[in-house]
Regions:
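A short tyrosine-centered beta-strand micro-motif
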Residues: 107-109
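Short, surface-exposed alpha-helix to beta-strand junction/turn motifs within ectodomains of secreted
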Residues: 55-56, 61-83
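N-terminal edge beta-strand
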Residues: 32-51
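Bacterial N-terminal signal peptides that target proteins for export
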Residues: 2-17
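N-terminal signal peptide c-region/cleavage motif recognized by signal peptidases
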Residues: 27-28
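Surface-exposed, short loops/turns at beta-strand junctions within beta-sandwich domains
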Residues: 100-105
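Extended, polar beta-sheet/loop recognition surfaces of beta-rich domains
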Residues: 50, 54-61, 119-134
């Protein structure tokens, strides 16, 4: 009789443990997926012959436009942009920032965005503009 109760108790523990693990996996899955930059124009480390008119960044998740920041910096780390980026109307995973006229040199794009799940990502990357003759 005692042996049957022990087996029953072990099966109940196993079922409880499996349910707890499944519950944790089910609820933690959205937390593991955060926004990430998947593409940019200009591209990372690109060398361009003509300056871009705008910066566009694409992410793997929708972006909260009110919390997006994209800044263009010159080689002295001075900001060249004063306006905020806008989420592209027909592509909520993308933001665009108009760029003033710039010349040759090394530039840095700094960005900070919040995805719709509330996760904030920030990073930066460089690109260069060279004369066609260089």
């Amino acid at each position: 009789m005692r042996n049957i109760q022990l087996k029953s108790f072990s099966v109940n523990q196993l079922i409880f443990l499996l349910m707890a693990i499944l519950s944790l996996l089910w609820h933690s899955n959205p937390v593991m997926a955060h926004a990430a930059l998947v593409k940019s124009d200009p591209p990372r480390r690109a060398t361009l012959s003509t300056p871009p008119k705008q910066i566009q960044l694409w992410f793997n998740e929708k972006i909260e436009g009110a919390y997006a920041s994209v800044v263009l910096l010159d080689s002295n780390k001075k900001s060249l942009t004063e306006n905020n980026p806008e989420v592209v109307a027909d592509d909520p995973k993308s933001v665009v920032l108009n760029v003033p006229e710039i010349g040759t040199g090394k530039y840095t794009i700094q960005y900070r965005v919040m995805s719709v799940d509330g996760h904030v990502i920030e990073s930066s990357f460089d690109f260069n503009i060279k004369n066609k003759m260089q």
